[in-house]
Regions:
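Hydrophobic protein-protein interaction segments
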Residues: 109-121, 125-126, 131-295
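Short polybasic/polar patches that bind polyanions
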Residues: 12, 43, 73, 87, ...
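A short, Lys/Arg-rich alpha-helix, primarily the initiator
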Residues: 1-36
């Protein structure tokens, strides 16, 4: 991706969405274009028009943290957008300023045992939306994603390439928008992650829905929320989710799902857990039978 174009488009789209009244500019209502003028952003940020024009052209080299924070306040950026602006500035700096990303690695047995010990649905994905681990009920919950040949175990591919995703996720539009915003956040954090860039290129090439959302330059921290799922075995589920980081493995994120106590979703989730346990027990019995026969 063209880093300068990323910076320029991000700042321009943030500037265009702000009305003069939101920025405290009164009395000037005749505008040919939406949003603030560059000179208004510069004045509110406390920098020269020339300096801001350079920044909006995509040149963040040497821009101080103080200026970035002031610019974030002027543009009314939220936490995710402010972090994204700092990530873009970090990527523009010398190599020593960039945070190293860990090399790809296998999911440790110790973490898999931890995941398996959790009673609620849990799955772990990386920055490229690949599912790298899950417990039995987590695999049962996301079976349509994991088993879909178009997805290849990747939630972004499932959403944008598989027609089944629109049934599985009743709130498909929100899910699609969230995935794109999360991918753009990760792209800002890891601009030289080739696998991530390749995935984004694949999605942009094959999906109009992805391209439209990618052009919006929205970013998001995917931490907590509500997920509605229409599961083929147990029906409709309304689940709260929480995302957790692995400090020793910053490329992975664990998601746990729970239902409100006494709700229909809790009952259906309990049924899904029973079905997952029966499937796991059956698989073990089959494996034990094969071992006995081989012996």
């Amino acid at each position: 991706m063209d880093h300068r174009a990323e910076v320029s488009d991000f700042l321009r789209t943030r500037r265009d969405r702000i009305t003069p009244s939101q920025a405290g500019i009164l009395g000037d209502t005749r505008r040919r274009v939406p949003g603030l003028r560059r000179e208004e952003v510069a004045a509110a940020t406390g920098i020269s028009v020339e300096y801001y024009a350079r920044i909006e052209r995509g040149d963040l080299r040497g821009v101080s943290t103080e200026v970035l924070d002031a610019l974030a306040r002027t543009l009314l950026l939220d936490e995710a957008e402010t972090d994204h602006l700092h990530d873009l500035a970090e990527a523009a700096g010398p190599p020593a300023r960039r945070r190293p990303r860990p090399a790809e690695q296998a999911f440790p047995d110790s973490l898999q045992r931890f995941v398996d010990a959790v009673s609620v649905p849990v799955w772990v994905r990386d920055r490229r939306m690949d599912v790298v681990a899950a417990n039995p009920v987590g695999r049962a919950l996301y079976a349509p994603v994991l088993e879909d040949p178009a997805a290849r175990g990747n939630t972004a591919r499932f959403v944008f390439f598989s027609p089944a995703s629109r049934t599985f996720f009743p709130d498909w539009e929100d899910n699609a928008t969230g995935i794109v915003a999360t991918l753009r956040t990760y792209a800002g954090q890891s601009p030289r992650d080739k696998r991530l860039s390749d995935l984004i290129g694949e999605l942009a090439t094959r999906s109009d829905d992805f391209r439209v959302r990618w052009a919006a330059h929205d970013v998001r921290h995917h931490r907590t929320g509500l997920k509605r799922i229409h599961h083929p075995e147990v029906g409709d589920l309304e689940l709260g989710y929480e995302a957790m980081d692995f400090p020793a493995h910053p490329d992975w994120f664990m998601f746990g799902y729970t239902a409100a106590p006494g709700s229909p979703s809790e009952e259906r989730l309990r049924l899904l857990g029973s079905l997952a346990q029966q499937s796991a027990d059956g698989a073990r019995s089959t494996a034990d039978g094969r071992s006995t026969a081989a012996g």
